[in-house]
Regions:
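Hydrophobic anchor residue at the start of the ABC signature
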Residues: 111
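Catalytic Walker B motif of ABC-type/P-loop ATPase nucleotide-binding domains
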Residues: 122-126
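Conserved ABC transporter NBD signature motif
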Residues: 33-46, 53
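Conserved ABC ATPase signature
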Residues: 97-101, 105
């Protein structure tokens, strides 16, 4: 399979569960063994060390499992994290224990942690699956603002076609681990 996501653009990726969407994101992020080639701005993944590649690629899994005990431990510099920007009404969230957060709060925290690393590419696997409509809109706006401000390329996986129409410029459909169609 072959496709291009230009800097500052978002590709929406849909398909049934098990069609290979997450496998594709994990392969691009170099988290699983794969045989393809991926490039960022013309530089092949093979020219980077694994850690340097993963600094350029921000992967947000459908459910983040790697957490420090407190929210604040996820941010080297708390100035990079504005809780209000991510829908937290109380700035004291930085002192909170992660295991006391709801799944939606953890999802927004995972996005904040991801964006604080300033990746050039965002790989978002169902980034709004655990969110209410208000926070879904908030995340869509945050990613759009980040994409526009930093020129990041984004691959956004979702089952919600209307969401993909809102957030992406190009949409692809996966079926049986293959790209089937390109809808504009």
């Amino acid at each position: 399979m072959s496709f291009i996501v230009d800097s500052g653009k978002c590709l929406g990726l849909s398909g049934q569960s098990g069609s290979g969407k997450t496998l594709l994101l994990r392969a691009i992020a170099d988290l699983d063994l794969n045989h393809g080639e991926v490039s960022i701005k013309g530089k092949k993944r093979s020219s980077f060390s694994g850690p340097n590649w993963r600094k350029k690629i921000g992967y947000l899994p459908a459910e983040s499992k790697r957490w420090h005990s407190s929210v604040g431990q996820h941010f080297d510099n708390a100035e990079n994290f504005s809780p209000e920007d991510f829908g937290f009404s109380d700035a004291s969230i930085i002192e909170s224990e992660v295991d006391k957060l709801s799944s939606g709060e953890k999802q927004r925290l995972a996005l904040a942690r991801l964006l604080s690393g300033l990746p050039e590419v965002l790989l978002l696997d169902e980034p709004t699956a655990n969110l209410d409509p208000h926070n879904t809109n908030l995340v869509e706006e945050l990613v759009n603002d980040y994409r526009n401000t930093h020129g990041a390329a984004v691959i956004w996986v979702a089952h919600n076609e209307s969401q993909l129409v809102r957030v992406s410029q190009t949409r692809l459909l996966m079926k049986n681990k293959s790209l089937l169609s390109n809808e504009n």
